């Protein structure tokens, strides 16, 4: 934000600008954030007697990291190194964002707003396989959902790893990574590219030996992923990947940013089919999207009522009354973290626990910078 009056300086999705100019009073900054110009500096401030331009710059992000082309920023100067914080979820993040030595090609984002709290979408993608055969029944009825059918969601595992969690589908038995990826519609060239970047004991073992295909996931707090493979025509399925951010506007409204992702070196025909599959299912007009949002808006609306304040919702799926899990950890799951087969709300509880821990943590005691003056304040 501009150091003058706090206006947002950059409002474009992408570009190649060499400078950034605040639209309010035209203060201008170089691409490295340093202040380049102040209109009427002499007349308005008496030059450096009123405001020293030298050495002024936009506030830098305290912590920044890049993985697979994605930029992650923390505003906490005491945040641990990103890879340390990401932990075991790095394994699953690579499925969605590292499928080729050429990198991933993104389209978007689509942006729209929903009258729902941001945490509902985040926790849904983290582990709610239970809703699929019910909320998305209409999608099944028209034949959009190919194999595996939604009622087989209970055969997949729910995993928790580091600050993230996700869902999987169980693949037909006896396959390897190539047959598993062909089963969900991947082109042979795309499979070869993925094998070139995935170590044999990593994702190929999860898909091949364990027989699980990653589906939806969330990285705390508000970054989600979805991988699905609907029918595009005559029984032929096409896989797609979507990356999405749940950006809070307020407690009752969320801006959704949704990107389509595909291997950059994939054949043009595969990219076209994959994008078509994405648009059918997700994005502002996707059929899955519309089903989900109707639920989330209703939950947010009823949560405002007096009756909702009297109710402690039950989020104990997968637990006995004494708090022990109904099923143990899956014995031969090739991915890192904790994995349990069947329905449960283990992942939602994990995500909300991380959120509660973040709220309890005191904010860092940082000095306030006084721009243009020779002092900082606490």
How would you name each of these model-derived features?
Residues 62-66, 70-378:
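C-terminal catalytic domain of Rieske-type non-heme iron oxygenases
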């Amino acid at each position: 934000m501009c150091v003058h009056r706090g206006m947002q300086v950059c409002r474009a999705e992408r570009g190649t600008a060499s400078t950034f100019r605040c639209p309010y009073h035209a203060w201008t900054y170089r691409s490295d954030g340093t202040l380049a110009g102040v209109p009427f500096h002499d007349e308005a401030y008496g030059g450096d007697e009123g405001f020293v331009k030298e050495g002024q710059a936009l506030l830098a992000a305290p912590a920044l990291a890049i993985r697979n082309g994605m930029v992650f920023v923390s505003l906490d100067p005491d945040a641990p190194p990103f890879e340390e914080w990401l932990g075991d979820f790095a394994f699953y993040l690579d499925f969605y964002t590292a499928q080729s030595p050429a990198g991933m090609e993104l389209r978007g984002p689509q942006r729209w707003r929903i009258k729902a709290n941001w945490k509902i979408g985040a926790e849904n993608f983290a582990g709610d396989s239970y809703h699929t055969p019910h909320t998305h029944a209409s999608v099944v009825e028209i034949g959009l959902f190919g194999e595996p059918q939604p009622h087989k969601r209970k055969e997949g595992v729910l995993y928790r790893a580091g600050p993230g969690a996700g869902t999987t589908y169980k693949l037909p038995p006896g396959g390897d990574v190539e047959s598993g990826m062909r089963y969900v519609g991947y082109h042979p060239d795309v499979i070869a590219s993925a094998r070139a970047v995935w170590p044999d004991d990593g994702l190929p073992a999860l898909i091949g030996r364990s027989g699980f295909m990653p589906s939806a996931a969330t990285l705390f707090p508000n970054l989600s992923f979805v991988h699905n493979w609907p029918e595009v025509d005559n029984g032929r399925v096409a896989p797609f990947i979507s990356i999405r951010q749940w950006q809070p506007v307020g407690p009752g409204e969320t801006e959704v940013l949704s990107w389509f992702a595909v291997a950059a070196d994939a054949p043009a025909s595969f990219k076209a089919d994959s994008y078509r599959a994405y648009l059918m299912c997700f994005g502002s007009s996707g059929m899955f999207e519309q089903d989900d949002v109707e639920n989330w808006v209703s939950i947010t609306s009823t949560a405002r009522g007096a009756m909702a304040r009297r109710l402690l919702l039950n989020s104990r799926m997968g637990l006995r009354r004494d708090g022990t899990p109904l099923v143990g950890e899956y014995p031969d799951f090739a991915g890192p973290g904790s994995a349990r087969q069947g329905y449960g709300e283990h992942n939602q509880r994990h995500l909300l626990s991380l959120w509660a821990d973040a709220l309890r943590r005191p904010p860092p005691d940082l000095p306030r910078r006084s721009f243009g003056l020779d002092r900082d304040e606490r």
